[in-house]
Amino acid sequence: MRVEYSKDLIRKGISTISQLKKAKIRVEKDDKKISYKDAKPGKIDVNEFKKAIYLLIEADDFLYKKAPKHELNEEEAKEFCKLIIKCQEHLNKILANFGFEFEEKEIDEGALYIVSNKKLFKKLKNKNPNLKVVCTEGMLDIEDMRAIGVPEKALEGLKKKVEIARKNVERFIEKYKPEKIFVVVEDDKDELLYLRAKNLYNAEKLDADEILD
């Protein structure tokens, strides 16, 4: 009798869990739906609207370049989707002025961000003053200086600067013990910085427009 009662409880428990899971799925799906009928009075953000349009125009080039099949290789797919995602972000900002709510990307304050120049450093700090950002003002290895075309005669004088930059990064790592280390990449020189930091500190790459948009 007790065994049958236990089995019955288990069956009811499984049934309840199943119903809760289904209900949760329905709620999550409903939460993601938006309708123009929910729009509130607001103001068009012209600047964000123009940014979205320019990105779509840039993405539109793929229709002509890849006609008639419109098949993209991996690099092309990344570039195309990057444009579309950035466009979507600008459109979300426009819709936010009309009462729609979107989950914003959170910037990881527990990470360390390595940048190559003071301009990028200031942009990140303006975005979020709490970010841990270290500026190298160049490369982390003299060989990378050579790779970007610095004359041989100038390399000797830059060795000390490179050494200081490296020690500065390591000082930040020791002080903050970051969960992750990112190199913010804006151009080809930053790519070199990223590759070196990946080798030295297991750093990850983060496109500048991903964190600054």
From Swiss-Prot:
Coiled coil residues, start to end: none
InterPro entries in alphabetical order: MJ1481_archaea
Alphabetized Pfam families for the sequence: DUF2100
Name of the protein in its database record: Uncharacterized protein MJ1481
